[in-house]
Amino acid sequence: MADEATRRVVSEIPVLKTNAGPRDRELWVQRLKEEYQSLIRYVENNKNSDNDWFRLESNKEGTRWFGKCWYIHDFLKYEFDIEFEIPITYPTTAPEIAVPELDGKTAKMYRGGKICLTDHFKPLWARNVPKFGLAHLMALGLGPWLAVEVPDLIQKGVIQHKEKCSQ
């Protein structure tokens, strides 16, 4: 997987038990409860370790998720909208997170602003179905992607802090 710190963070995220997706009706409701419990625990753990970096909410059915994530670089906060839909084959298929604001600004992204997770994250997800959920997607997918891509985009001048842009 990754370094020891990442392993520790992931070990503190509750694993999920219900193997269900949106078309499984009653089982999907149970899976959503587990997803929310896992996300809440992950966010609480992040806040307790002064590493709060995203907010997520969903539509009523739990099939469309949206929110914000942020990355601190040189004491400046870079904030981005995020969105994803739960695939009909979830949890076998991991959701594809989109950061629309960064669409076309990095090679590690597909059309529509969907971040590239194929090489590192998707094989890990596949080995851990149905135990991994949305909290794991954030911790092992979006978090590391932001940590690599945002500083690189800043260094190349592709993105600038909003305060610097308004001056």
From Swiss-Prot:
Keywords: Isopeptide bond, Ubl conjugation, Ubl conjugation pathway. SUPFAM superfamilies: UBC-like. The active site is at C116 (glycyl thioester intermediate). CDD domains: UBCc_UFC1. It holds the Pfam family UFC1. There is a cross-link at K122 (Glycyl lysine isopeptide (Lys-Gly) (interchain with G-Cter in UFM1)). It comes from the Eukaryota. GO terms for molecular function: UFM1 conjugating enzyme activity. Ufmylated at Lys-122. Deufmylated by UFSP1. InterPro entries: UBQ-conjugating_enzyme/RWD, Ufc1. One of its GO terms (biological process) is response to endoplasmic reticulum stress. In absence of UBA5, the active site is solvated by water molecules thereby reducing its nucleophilic activity. A linker region of UBA5 is required to reduce the amount of water molecules in the vicinity of the active site and elevate its nucleophilic activity. Belongs to the ubiquitin-conjugating enzyme family. UFC1 subfamily. E2-like enzyme which specifically catalyzes the second step in ufmylation. Accepts the ubiquitin-like modifier UFM1 from the E1 enzyme UBA5 and forms an intermediate with UFM1 via a thioester linkage. Ufmylation is involved in various processes, such as ribosome recycling, response to DNA damage, interferon response or reticulophagy (also called ER-phagy). PANTHER family: UBIQUITIN-FOLD MODIFIER-CONJUGATING ENZYME 1 (PTHR12921:SF0). Interacts with UBA5 (via C-terminus). Interacts with UFL1. Interacts with UFM1. Interacts with KIRREL3. This is Ubiquitin-fold modifier-conjugating enzyme 1. It comes from Mus musculus (Mouse).
